[in-house]
């Protein structure tokens, strides 16, 4: 389990000081050194400071857009299947907009991936 900041700041538009304070606020609630930058946007000064603080920065390969009510579930499933590769890191969200997908579609995807021979692993904290 990792975290994603406290208030979801865009690293490109947020000062290093504010960004790091936001990450620290989240880290106080979720004690993990795994961190995924919101929007995948992180400046080099923020990246270096986070690394110095001991964070392991983890990016992703596919965003599910599970929060988008306009995206049809069958299109989401098709997209996830098409973009599956060994080592892929998918982003799913744990917010109210994404609950229908998490409850209904994610189990179907996980069953599909297992049938295809994929396994699920945690990202190590070190």
Question: How would you describe each model-predicted region?
Answer:
Residues 13, 17-20, 40, 74, ...:
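Soluble non-cytosolic domains of exported or imported proteins
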Residues 6, 16-44, 48-51, 78-93, ...:
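CE4/NodB-like, metal-dependent polysaccharide N-deacetylase domain
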Residues 8-14, 66-68:
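A short acidic, helix-capping loop that chelates divalent metal ions and anchors anionic groups
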Residues 100-126:
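C-terminal domain-boundary segment and adjacent tail
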Residues 63-65, 95-98:
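Short Gly/Pro-enriched loop/turn and capping motifs at secondary-structure junctions
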Residues 33, 41, 47-83, 117-126:
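His/Asp/Glu-enriched short active-site or ligand-binding loop at hydrolase and phosphoryl-transfer sites
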Residues 44, 98-99:
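Short glycine-rich, flexible loops that bind phosphorylated cofactors or substrates
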């Amino acid at each position: 389990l990792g975290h994603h900041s406290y208030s979801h700041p865009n690293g490109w538009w947020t000062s290093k000081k504010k960004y790091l304070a936001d990450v620290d606020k989240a880290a106080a609630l979720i004690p993990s050194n795994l961190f995924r930058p919101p929007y995948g946007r992180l400046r080099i000064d923020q990246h270096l400071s986070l690394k110095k603080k001991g964070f392991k920065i983890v990016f992703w390969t596919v965003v599910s857009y599970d929060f988008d009510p306009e995206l049809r579930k069958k299109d989401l499933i098709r997209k996830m299947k098409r973009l599956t590769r060994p080592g892929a890191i998918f982003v799913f969200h744990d917010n109210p907009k994404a609950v229908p997908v998490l409850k209904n579609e994610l189990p179907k995807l996980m069953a599909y991936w297992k049938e295809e021979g994929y396994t699920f692993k945690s990202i190590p904290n070190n």
